[in-house]
Amino acid sequence: MTQQDRTAVQYHKMTETPIPRLILSLAAPTILSMLITSIYNLADTFFVGRISTSASGAVGVVSSLMAIIQALGFMLGHGSGTIISRRLGSQDTHAATRFASTSFFTALAFGVVLAVVGLATLPDFMMLLGSTETILLHACAYARPILLAAPLMISSLVMNNILRYEGKANLAMIGLVTGGLLNIALDPLFMFGLGLGTAGAGIATALSQTISFGILLYMFLRGKTVSQFRLSAVTREPREFLQILAGGAPSFGRQGLNSIGGMLLNIAARSYGDAAVAGMSIVSRIFMFILSVAIGVGQGLQPVASFNYGARKYHRVRQAAIFTLKAAFALLVVLIAVCWWNDENLIRLFRDDPEVTAVALPAFRYQCFAILLQPVIVVTNMTFQSVGKAGRATFLACCRQGVCFIPLILVLPRVLGLVGVELCQPIADALTCFISLPFLLAFLRQLEQMDKAEASHAPAQL
């Protein structure tokens, strides 16, 4: 099949397949990828928790470093991916290659800078991310290999997102799932079999992510994608580079503020000891696993929304957003019901310490209610980002952490003590949902109006 034939087949699939079937077909491998990623994060928490409470706290500290890596990768991946998908929707394959190449090589450069700066200032960097003196040794050992692999990890996120936005979620899944399963297998081998302790968890993560990078790169080099990587295709136009940054600004804002929020959460919790840092870290990892289902469904929405918006099929964008909202909510209800009845056992699975459980259990129960509001937040943000509404998407992406969580974590612990630390995240989720909902409802109405205008061949602008 020629490149032109593959492009035509992909266009027909993205613009003609019934919305529920299309989203579920794209979401299923993405959900699996997200779950595997969350499982290997949980595996790190589980195995490191076998060492000590201080080592378990190091997982929470290094998760802020991972959020920085994800912020850079998602900024370039989502930023280029939304443009690539819309350009493919309008059948401009040359532009797709240009934006893909620019984001990939920029990711490598950003990763090198992060690795050099992070390794040169490692102890201070870990303290900045919320480490205590007793956690510091574990945090540095865990973070060092991850920083060395940062260029490949950021580039992998870019490739994964480009594949998804092209509608090739199955290919993206292969790289991520392979890396995740390897991470789970290598954790106990390096940590306990080779006696490397916390450093072994970092080495396992770095090695598995390097292999994932190789698999994803193979997909592009073997011509399995429409867009390609060529150094000669990197844009020389500052305007196009700024388009990538603008399109990825919501992801960068969301993940960057996640890192800052995680740092402030660690700092607030460390006032109550290593058990508090470990307890909040465990709760965060468990709920990241649950939330990965909603995010996975939302990522199934993104290429559908981008592609059909570029093809001016606005009714399909609207249908996709509504279906995703319903599907994500239904899945979360089932997961929360299971977790609610096994809450204490889940927490003890990661660290069987009464002090850790005493901190984590109330936070876990508060979060069970708040996470049911996440589908509104996820669908609103991902829809705006997918159709190129960078301003609204950036505001909403930054809203949860920047507008809601960070002010709360600075104030509530001073007023309510440890309970304030535990309540910050669920309150932030509730506030963000109430802010997001009017944006979503208004945009759904606008899509309906644009579709009517398109049907009558009248120009439609938002």
Feature-to-residue mapping (PLM):
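Short alpha-helical transmembrane segments in multi-pass integral membrane proteins
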Residues: 1-27, 84-151, 193-249, 305-370, ...
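Residue-level signal for short hydrophobic patches within transmembrane helices
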Residues: 16, 20-39, 43, 65-72, ...
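Transmembrane helical elements of multi-pass membrane transporters/channels
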Residues: 25-44, 145, 179, 208-212, ...
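Transmembrane alpha-helix boundary and packing residues in multipass membrane permease domains
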Residues: 30, 34, 46, 63, ...
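Helix-terminus/linker motif at the lipid-water interface of multi-pass membrane proteins
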Residues: 35, 39-57, 126-133, 189-198, ...
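Short runs within selected transmembrane alpha-helices of multi-pass transporters and secretion channels
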Residues: 77, 146-164, 172-180, 201-216, ...
